[in-house]
Amino acid sequence: MITDTIVELEGVNGERFNLTTGDQGVFLATDVEGCFYDPPVKVVYEEPGNYPGARYLGHRVLKRDIVFGVQILNDAKQGPRSWLSRDSVWRKAWAFNRVCKLYVTTPDSGTRYLYLALFESPKVEMKTDPRGNTINLTVMSCISYDPFWYEDDRVFSVKTKTDTRFDPNFWTPPWPWEELPKETLRIKVGREQGGLNPTDQYIAPKWTVPGSTEKIPDFPWPFPPGVEIPWETAPFTQFVIPDYSFEDEEFANRRLKTPGLIYGENCIIDTDRREEQISSESGSPVWARMNGVRFRNMIPPYTEEREFVIDASGCAPGQVVTLRLPRPWSRCWGLE
């Protein structure tokens, strides 16, 4: 049987192995377990006393326990083509506390990758000295804490064209959003860009928004520790970021306003509720200034398109807002 599937491994040290062609004398063996198809899932249910059968409550995707072997060639007694050298190079690519990336490339689905680490030490049969064999099987017991296969994130960006900077001293805090100069930005993602979410999993968009390009007048940078920032005179940017619901019509156009972002507060907004909501380049706790308001909507599987509308204020021309869309899959191929 001829296959055009390419399997590669990128080690923790950056070493790359093509396990299909065996470019380093290491080939993927047969009988791979727990790797290429759907991850294990545990269903939670209840069995009420007055209800026939059971009722579904939820389910949880579990880690992957992966076992596979590699055949390592022994083409020389010594040197880089020997089994000992190749086995050493292979082992140095692995760690228990750092992850490798296993890549699978197919003509239909492109390239997807899985993060995995050692779960047990590699095993080699020692009935005889493996240095005397022409080929040796090494069994790898691995764990994938994140069970999904990923494509590279899709990134979309838009630049500000209008100068919406203003003098914060013109108003008395809090600054009235309705009166601030603003620019409306739009990012449209559709079929031409590969779809908004073509995967079989829910995804949480990530945004990057820039802080002000202007430093605080008569105030040192970096900010001295223990000295209160004069917020009333600090130039800032502010944004209204989409948090659209695709499953609840009431919140189909929901958007959230960010806090004012001063110089050094270029921010990443992660709408995944399991992660820190807003992280700042300067390390300042911008998330604490959200007053408990959170992003809460994810993009469902197989969502084709949507236009995202962003309002920006306090920006110089040329500042960039980006939208990053993850691409998680249950399998290394198919499901499109």
Swiss-Prot record:
Lineage: Viruses, Duplodnaviria, Heunggongvirae, Uroviricota, Caudoviricetes
Protein name: Minor tail protein Gp27
Domain of life the protein comes from: Viruses
